Amino acid sequence: MSLLRDKMNRLRGNIREEENQPGAVVPATEEKVAQLPEDDEEWLSPVWETFDVKLVTNEIGSFLLRKIIYPSDFRHGHHALVELHEAAPALSAFHPDSLTSAEQIMFLDLETTGLGVGAGNVPFMVGIGYLSKDQFVIEQALIRHPAEERAMLHYLMGKLNDYTFLSTYNGKTFDWPLVQNRFIMNGLGQKMWEPQHLDFLHPARSIWRNTLVSCKLSHVEEERLGIHREDDVPGSLAPQLYFQFLANGDPAPLEGVFRHNEIDMLSLACLAIRFGHLLNGTIKLYIPLPDEPEEMVRTGLWLERMGKMELPDHLFDMAMKEENSKPSTLVMLAARDKKAGNWDRAVLLWQKAIIHSSNHFGSAAHEASIELAMYYEHKIKDFESALGYANAAFEHALNHSQIIRPDAKKRAELDALRNRIARLRRKSTKHVH
């Protein structure tokens, strides 16, 4: 017993130190979130109390719950949680027929026993977050064994009905389908709530797929949200730690899983703030605009897809003026201008892409050469210029085919370029005569 007591004392000491730090978690001690058992029928290990986990019961059964309350002025990385109020209405761009408010968003993140949404994958921890009375509340429900899952899901069901929007990170594909499956398997019904999804993985990939090494939440938050986790338990280890708890009954290793999930919830709120600020055009009031040309262009293209046609031009102009813009970025922006009928800038961008590829004529310069060949042939009727660009594209394609055996698509492209060159030579000769 002395060893257990020493361990508990050390845990309590660590918690007290964290609570004395700026921005410490405020435990939910005043508001009852569910009926607490009034007798001693179920004994809860004192170790749970060291990280503010309580045993709760409802008409279905029991489960564990941890509740943390953050003040609205709490800063998580670059953003304060109070910014949700200003940013949330702009998130209506995800669902133009709905009006978004910060109070109507529920944030959801699961810790599960495995991957996929099949019957063998169980969410052993469900984290939810929401605004309440200018505070950001995080609730984390945990089951100590499978028999508690139904009670946990019943509690979640009661919470969901108060919200319209569900904010996740890959939740449209993973978290929410898994929750729905668990509701059905536990006899709690189907389609009990149909959320308006705010899945922030998709805009993250749209904007950062090439400028960040990974679009995992932990990487996005560090590189773009200014959030640095210390002594974090990786999400991939959460199932292992949970199974360890099931095997020996010691809850201590799960404290790190609770903390990991808690940070995920805060980061989800900050992503809502970031994308909301981008959509309402106020982002530069809070953080500097992106300084990488590709991120500028991808951000602008995403804003256009979200219906914010008036916002991207400044980003596009900045990207075009950057001397270090990659040829692929210039070609991407040129494709947008071509579609919009802005031929003058499209031509300038294609030409700039080729100039920037002078040391290495890569795929972007190849694409730019083909586009310029088509432009000068069909729009300007300058067959000599068109022939020059077509020859450059053919030479690149031919050299590439000698290094890597071409597939059917590449062979068809070579044949198309041969035909284009032959046609341009005929047109050029006729034009001279």
Which role fits each region the language model picked out?
Residues 1-102:
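N-terminal accessory regions of nucleic-acid-interacting proteins
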Residues 206, 212-289:
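Acidic, Mg2+-coordinating catalytic module of metal-dependent nucleases/exonucleases
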